[in-house]
């Protein structure tokens, strides 16, 4: 193999980094780029006088040389089972080096750890988040090596399709412009500690800043300006134990001072406000917490709890706990025992240390969600508090000593959660002292060029918002401008200053930001930026930004995609509002509409609550309603104008001669709204975490809620709410809101029970939507019978008359509240407090005491308001019943007034004669009918004389009470049955009966 001399600039660059304690970046281009890593690593090891540095190797797909297969091969080589190919340097490198292979999806576990070399391959899988996580783990003097495949020009990266772009594309917007990659390459050209080489380590002329690399003078290099102060502090605490032994382990004056402050708080053993420690990456926060834990053990604290987003983030913390134990002369196994996790995801991280030297003490890791385990805590330490959801951090603070540390800029701290919300709230509520700050870097020395490059690239220093010196213009004098993203991410000096201002407003006014948001802002094809500016005073200076609005176009989804989504459960990327609304209401036509979603509205923190946000939203609504007309004669810019990324032909490329420079033709950064044609939209929407203030803001802006998530957000513990506004009046928005209000009203007693009453009332009332066309049926008697029994109404009547207490009608409040808030009870007028009481007691199921605390009202006043509301409700129900009864009665207009009466044609005498004739005729007819019948058998026998004698005989008392007279007809001896039909007559009895003397005496007589 022919050996080639390596460019001396590579060796000088690495040696300078080791002398200065600064990191060095190499971009290796070519298919054999991986084979150059051992060479660069060998130069590094020869330049340092310490143990061989560890390597963090990150990849998207499994790399057999780095993963388990490579480890097994390295073991076989070490024991001599496999011969090492001397030509293959990678085998020797693999055997002699500790390499930690990580998938990009697992890099969250490397936070807080330190490596000597970081290798990043599979450039298409890189994201700003991954870049920030991995680069910041490299110590001073270490290497960051970025491996790229063969390229004809670095400008090919401008149009490379990145993996993250799949999430940016939507069905209606497929073309992605790689503005972030262009800005990344241009920023590398400005970095003095970055070299671009090919796969035979030939240095490429990326920029003129790396043409000459001169060795630095090692005299005074790497020394801290506060070294004398650190030495003085260590000497002053030398005789004070355990503080002296622990402070002696600190590397910087800031870190030593922080440890001393923590120890001072531990000595008192009294409940104090939480102490905070803030710093940028690599300043030694975790190490300071670890030494403080060792001091707490020495002072006798029994239950010490440590929490962090992930146990692997605490590797440095526990490492310095053990170093503190060594300084205090604790012996492992004799004085303490280490327990590691058996969870495969935690990679055998330390989760517990049991100390048994003088008494039983415990250092225990708990997950951020296990706040219920802190009841017996004596000390709680929270590492990387900014990466933990803010509600969980608030729950952790209790009646025990709390130390917390967090990154306020850098990857973990790119949100205002800790620096602006939590710490300021602690200072206000608990009278806590200002947070301790670590300025000096430990992982690498100050003025590290790689740190400056990364901060500028990802705008990680945006936590400090520049103040505006131009005063407060009136909102009506401010105008909204469209921001051209090609110009914003062109890496022009003015554009960079404007971008940093814009991102700083984002970070300071939004809960959580990540570096990935910057790439979405730059590359997502459906996203657009607007900013509200005051009156421009100077034309030679950048205008001050008051409000930033980021929007995303959504909708225009095909019928086939809608069918796949709703029928098969598949959802495409993006289009948040169309998919959620279509799924919520089963409307297959809504995703076909074109809409715009307001992703963020960020107001400068010094000018919040002054009407600027409302003004910006109003101008945006007018813009998409096409109310901004161009009064000039010049042509209007197309909405697709300004595609600033130039495609370069391969014949024109030369990697060995190419120098990267910003584009010479840059479009206008800011455009007036009338200079750009707006996209056609059917609605404007927004999605945000529901709070009372934000709901009030969007309602005042004319938006209507149509969706409320039942699952709260893990980071903010808020429920996502979608609100819509239509430029033109549409009936479907009122129907959506009517259904939304009905659903939310039912869920307020379940999922949304913990909501504040005023928030629930705000959800149920909206003046921006017309619900008249979708009004429900007003309460009537049949509906009243469905909801209430007569006895229920009697109970309500009894309470209204003060004849019973309110608990007797508590069960009726649910139905009353449902009817009232659905608008079914016509004529029932309640004030705002009465509405809140009815909603809280009837729907949310809150108690009177809890509601009194929430509304800040005494119980007797609350019940008085409640009584008045129920009295009015009873009157409405009575009016419904009265109307029903009146409806069943004849109205006065329906009564007969005699208009249809006619005079009689006959006189009274003639009418009586006529009736008598009819009666006589009827009697004669009846008599004739009776004569025709045979009534002889019913004739009573005997004469008048016979009946008189019989009566006299009976009257004297000699008889038996029966009257008997002679009939004059002789009866036969046997019974005779007369039949009308002789053939059917039954035969006479053949058996002859004996004559009875009594029967013979009574023959011929008839008994009555």
Swiss-Prot record:
Residues that coordinate or bind acetyl-CoA: 601-603, 608-614, 700
Positions where Phosphoserine occurs in the chain: 907
Primary localization class, coarse: nucleus
Spans annotated as Disordered: 950-1008
CDD domains: NAT_SF
Enzyme Commission number, as recorded: 2.3.1.-
Function in brief: RNA cytidine acetyltransferase with specificity toward both 18S rRNA and tRNAs. Catalyzes the formation of N(4)-acetylcytidine (ac4C) in 18S rRNA. Required for early nucleolar cleavages of precursor rRNA at sites A0, A1 and A2 during 18S rRNA synthesis. Catalyzes the formation of ac4C in serine and leucine tRNAs. Requires a tRNA-binding adapter protein for full tRNA acetyltransferase activity but not for 18S rRNA acetylation. Polycomb group (PcG) protein.
UniProt protein name: RNA cytidine acetyltransferase
Gene responsible for this protein: l(1)G0020
